[in-house]
Amino acid sequence: MGRRNNTNVPDFILTGLSDSEEVQMALFILFLLIYLITMLGNVGMILIIRLDLQLHTPMYFFLTHLSFIDLSYSTVITPKTLANLLTSNYISFMGCFAQMFFFVFLGAAECFLLSSMAYDRYVAICSPLRYPVIMSKRLCCALVTGPYVISFINSFVNVVWMSRLHFCDSNVVRHFFCDTSPILALSCMDTYDIEIMIHILAGSTLMVSLITISASYVSILSTILKINSTSGKQKALSTCASHLLGVTIFYGTMIFTYLKPRKSYSLGRDQVASVFYTIVIPMLNPLIYSLRNKEVKNALIRVMQRRQDSR
């Protein structure tokens, strides 16, 4: 962001999702409700895992960090979106790039964390007897720290390159938050090199994590098919079902939105996809990982019982 003097734009105007006051009020109520559910679900998931000793396992260690990322991810976007729906659509130059940095950082971190979770499921199903030895505390910490470090570097490089853009006198961002595609579309200079760099960073993040997840699930499926008992197969499948559903939803919207050239950016279509993965998915993840999970339900019951007994 050292070359801010290259632009005459002190701030940006976010066009939002609608010009209609009635629609804006309806969206405000809807997004506020979703955000409150997101906060409650993710904070609740973190607290249950922290308070119940039986959930102090690698699987739930990763799930704690997924909830933290989803909570942070939603907080980077939703509060500003809510404010824009009621008041001014302005966001400062620095505020815009700060939002972009944390958005890219947390999005990439979730990609790599989902890979770590897939590897955890692979070890649990393919090498159950060696699981406690392989998934040591040291390895678990590395599988969580790695995504944060790599994603920080990824996002930092992304924002440094984006800060080199010239915006001339145009400052209307045709989106409801500061994402890379609409900011690139706003620039009055040749963005080819920056687009290539962003596609390399985004593409490598998605491909590395997807290859890791795919390889893990191919091995998992191969192992499940070798299980003779029907109950054993169902138990193994149920262990992975929630994670696989979360991966499918998250990666589906990310690939649809980002792995395409700037010229194919569509305001309405891309905004719907963006609402889904920035506001809706952080709300869905706690539901996906808890509703079908008996361990989480039982842990919640135990925590509530202990609280009642302590009174």
Swiss-Prot record:
<keyword id="KW-1015">Disulfide bond</keyword>
<keyword id="KW-0675">Receptor</keyword>
<dbReference type="Pfam" id="PF13853">
    <property type="entry name" value="7tm_4"/>
</dbReference>
<protein>
    <recommendedName>
        <fullName>Olfactory receptor 8H1</fullName>
    </recommendedName>
</protein>
<dbReference type="InterPro" id="IPR017452">
    <property type="entry name" value="GPCR_Rhodpsn_7TM"/>
</dbReference>
<feature type="transmembrane region" description="Helical; Name=3">
    <location>
        <begin position="99"/>
        <end position="119"/>
    </location>
</feature>
<feature type="transmembrane region" description="Helical; Name=2">
    <location>
        <begin position="55"/>
        <end position="75"/>
    </location>
</feature>
<dbReference type="GO" id="GO:0004930">
    <property type="term" value="F:G protein-coupled receptor activity"/>
</dbReference>
<dbReference type="GO" id="GO:0004984">
    <property type="term" value="F:olfactory receptor activity"/>
</dbReference>
<dbReference type="GO" id="GO:0005886">
    <property type="term" value="C:plasma membrane"/>
</dbReference>
<feature type="topological domain" description="Cytoplasmic">
    <location>
        <begin position="217"/>
        <end position="236"/>
    </location>
</feature>
<keyword id="KW-0552">Olfaction</keyword>
<feature type="transmembrane region" description="Helical; Name=1">
    <location>
        <begin position="26"/>
        <end position="46"/>
    </location>
</feature>
<dbReference type="GO" id="GO:0007608">
    <property type="term" value="P:sensory perception of smell"/>
</dbReference>
<feature type="transmembrane region" description="Helical; Name=7">
    <location>
        <begin position="271"/>
        <end position="291"/>
    </location>
</feature>
<feature type="topological domain" description="Extracellular">
    <location>
        <begin position="1"/>
        <end position="25"/>
    </location>
</feature>
<comment type="similarity">
    <text>Belongs to the G-protein coupled receptor 1 family.</text>
</comment>
<keyword id="KW-0812">Transmembrane</keyword>
<feature type="topological domain" description="Cytoplasmic">
    <location>
        <begin position="120"/>
        <end position="138"/>
    </location>
</feature>
<dbReference type="InterPro" id="IPR000725">
    <property type="entry name" value="Olfact_rcpt"/>
</dbReference>
<keyword id="KW-0325">Glycoprotein</keyword>
<feature type="transmembrane region" description="Helical; Name=5">
    <location>
        <begin position="197"/>
        <end position="216"/>
    </location>
</feature>
<feature type="topological domain" description="Cytoplasmic">
    <location>
        <begin position="292"/>
        <end position="311"/>
    </location>
</feature>
<dbReference type="GO" id="GO:0005549">
    <property type="term" value="F:odorant binding"/>
</dbReference>
<feature type="disulfide bond">
    <location>
        <begin position="96"/>
        <end position="188"/>
    </location>
</feature>
<feature type="transmembrane region" description="Helical; Name=4">
    <location>
        <begin position="139"/>
        <end position="159"/>
    </location>
</feature>
<feature type="topological domain" description="Extracellular">
    <location>
        <begin position="160"/>
        <end position="196"/>
    </location>
</feature>
<keyword id="KW-0472">Membrane</keyword>
<feature type="glycosylation site" description="N-linked (GlcNAc...) asparagine">
    <location>
        <position position="5"/>
    </location>
</feature>
<feature type="topological domain" description="Extracellular">
    <location>
        <begin position="76"/>
        <end position="98"/>
    </location>
</feature>
<comment type="function">
    <text>Odorant receptor.</text>
</comment>
<feature type="topological domain" description="Cytoplasmic">
    <location>
        <begin position="47"/>
        <end position="54"/>
    </location>
</feature>
<keyword id="KW-1133">Transmembrane helix</keyword>
<feature type="transmembrane region" description="Helical; Name=6">
    <location>
        <begin position="237"/>
        <end position="257"/>
    </location>
</feature>
<keyword id="KW-0807">Transducer</keyword>
<feature type="topological domain" description="Extracellular">
    <location>
        <begin position="258"/>
        <end position="270"/>
    </location>
</feature>
<keyword id="KW-0716">Sensory transduction</keyword>
<dbReference type="GO" id="GO:0007186">
    <property type="term" value="P:G protein-coupled receptor signaling pathway"/>
</dbReference>
<keyword id="KW-0297">G-protein coupled receptor</keyword>
<keyword id="KW-1003">Cell membrane</keyword>
<dbReference type="InterPro" id="IPR000276">
    <property type="entry name" value="GPCR_Rhodpsn"/>
</dbReference>
